[in-house]
C-alpha cells in the first residue's frame, strides 16, 4: 500500500480481497441508500453494478463512446435526476474516461465519483493516476489485469474523513486497525 500511496500520490490506500470488495466499500462510504440512483456505463463487469445494487441503489446505465468504450461524458448530465447520488466511470482497458467533464458534473450536482480503475493501474489522465481523481478509486490485481497477484484489489481516496469507517469495514466491523496501532486495548 505504501508503494501505491507514493506512486499515485494518494493519501489513503486500503488493500482488499478484490476490486469488487473495493467497490462495495466505496458504495458504503459514499452513503448510497435504497432508492438512490447511480450512473455508470452500459458496458462494464457485473461487479461494478452489484456493489451499488447491494446498497439498494437503482443503476442508471449510460451509453458508451465507440472510440474508447468508456462512458460517454456528454450523456451523463441528461441522466442526472434529483435521486442521483454518484457517477461511476469505468476506465476500460486502461483508457481514462473524460474525468475533467465528469468532475465538473459531480461538483455541479454534488455527486460522489467512484472510479472503477480495475484495468487502470499505472494508467494516467492528464498526468494523474486513474483512480485518484474522483472521491474513490477501485483497483483490481486479478490475473487478467495490469498488475497481477492472482486476486486482490485496492480502494484509494484522498479525504481522511473516510479512514475510520474504511478501516472498520475492512476489519469486518471491528476497530482492529486501532488495536494494531496501540490506540485501543482490545477489539
Where are the regions a protein language model picked out?
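Short loop-beta-helix segment that forms the pyridoxal 5′-phosphate
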Residues: 2-26, 40-43, 62
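Short active-site oxyanion
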Residues: 11-12, 36-37, 152
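PLP-dependent aminotransferase-like
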Residues: 28-92, 96-117, 124
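Radical SAM/AdoMet-radical enzyme domain recognition
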Residues: 105-110, 128-136
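Active-site region of PLP-dependent enzymes
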Residues: 120-126, 133-187
Amino acid at each position: 500500500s505504501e508503494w501505491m500511496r507514493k506512486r499515485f500520490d494518494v493519501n489513503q490506500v486500503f488493500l482488499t480481497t478484490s476490486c469488487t470488495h473495493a467497490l462495495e466499500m466505496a458504495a458504503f462510504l459514499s452513503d448510497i441508500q435504497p432508492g438512490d440512483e447511480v450512473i455508470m456505463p452500459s458496458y462494464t463487469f457485473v461487479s461494478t453494478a452489484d456493489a451499488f445494487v447491494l446498497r439498494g441503489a437503482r443503476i442508471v446505465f449510460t451509453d458508451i463512446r465507440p472510440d474508447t468504450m468508456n462512458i460517454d461524458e456528454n450523456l451523463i448530465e441528461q441522466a442526472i435526476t434529483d435521486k442521483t447520488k454518484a457517477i461511476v466511470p469505468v476506465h476500460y482497458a486502461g483508457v481514462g474516461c473524460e474525468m475533467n467533464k465528469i468532475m465538473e458534473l459531480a461538483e455541479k450536482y454534488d455527486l460522489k465519483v467512484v472510479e472503477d480503475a480495475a484495468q487502470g493501474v499505472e494508467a494516467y489522465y492528464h498526468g494523474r493516476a486513474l483512480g485518484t481523481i474522483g472521491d474513490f478509486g477501485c483497483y483490481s490485481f486479478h490475473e487478467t489485469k495490469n498488475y497481477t497477484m492472482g486476486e486482490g484489489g485496492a480502494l484509494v481516496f484522498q479525504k481522511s474523513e473516510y479512514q475510520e469507517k474504511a478501516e472498520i469495514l475492512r476489519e469486518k466491523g471491528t476497530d482492529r486497525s486501532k488495536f494494531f496501532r496501540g490506540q485501543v486495548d482490545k477489539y
